């Protein structure tokens, strides 16, 4: 007859808790959180948003089965000089973004902080251009300031 896998006594709570804590290290999300790996490898360094300068406009081809050129920009972040690709949302949104503009980017909202939908390798999206919301520009509520 084989023994029990876990203690089942009246005073076994501490032992059970310690055992559970030990096995948490086999969970991916726990390891990433405890070792602070997001801050280490994320270009935004764990921040929800970041400021950057537009280097160029690029068209990224959509994944199968879709066929489109998703309008994106290459952005150099101010805080660490890293270059990332950010999606410019809305129909005609790219018309409000020019090279050398200052933009604010945020995560695009894909699973586990990755790319979303049919846009391969793009993890961020543009939310502001030269201090004005891209949505306000697109709706015609505000004018884009010249810097």
UniProtKB/Swiss-Prot annotation:
GO terms, biological process: translation
UniProt-recorded name of the protein: Small ribosomal subunit protein uS12
GO cellular component: small ribosomal subunit
Keywords on record: Ribonucleoprotein, Ribosomal protein, RNA-binding, rRNA-binding
Family per similarity comment: Belongs to the universal ribosomal protein uS12 family.
Subunit text: Part of the 30S ribosomal subunit.
Gene that this sequence comes from: rps12
Domain of life: Archaea
Entry-linked InterPro entries: NA-bd_OB-fold, Ribosomal_uS12, Ribosomal_uS12_arc, Ribosomal_uS12_euk/arc
HAMAP family (UniProt xref): Ribosomal_uS12_A
A Pfam family annotated for this UniProt entry: Ribosom_S12_S23
Entry coiled-coil feature ranges: none
Single annotated GO MF: structural constituent of ribosome
Organism: Aeropyrum pernix (strain ATCC 700893 / DSM 11879 / JCM 9820 / NBRC 100138 / K1)
Function: With S4 and S5 plays an important role in translational accuracy. Located at the interface of the 30S and 50S subunits.
């Amino acid at each position: 007859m084989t023994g029990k896998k876990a203690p089942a006594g009246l005073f076994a709570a501490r032992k059970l808790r310690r055992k559970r804590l030990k096995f948490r290290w086999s969970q991916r999300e726990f390891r990433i959180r405890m070792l602070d790996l997001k801050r280490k490898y994320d270009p935004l360094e764990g921040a929800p948003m970041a400021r950057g300068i537009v280097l160029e406009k690029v068209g990224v081809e959509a994944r199968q089965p879709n066929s489109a050129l998703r309008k994106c920009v290459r952005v150099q972040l101010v805080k660490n000089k890293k270059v990332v690709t950010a999606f410019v949302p809305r129909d005609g949104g790219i018309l409000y973004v020019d090279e050398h503009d200052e933009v604010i980017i945020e995560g695009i909202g894909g699973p586990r902080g990755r790319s979303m939908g049919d846009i391969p390798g793009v993890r961020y999206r543009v939310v502001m251009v030269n201090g004005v919301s891209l949505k306000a520009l697109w709706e015609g509520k505000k004018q884009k300031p010249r810097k």
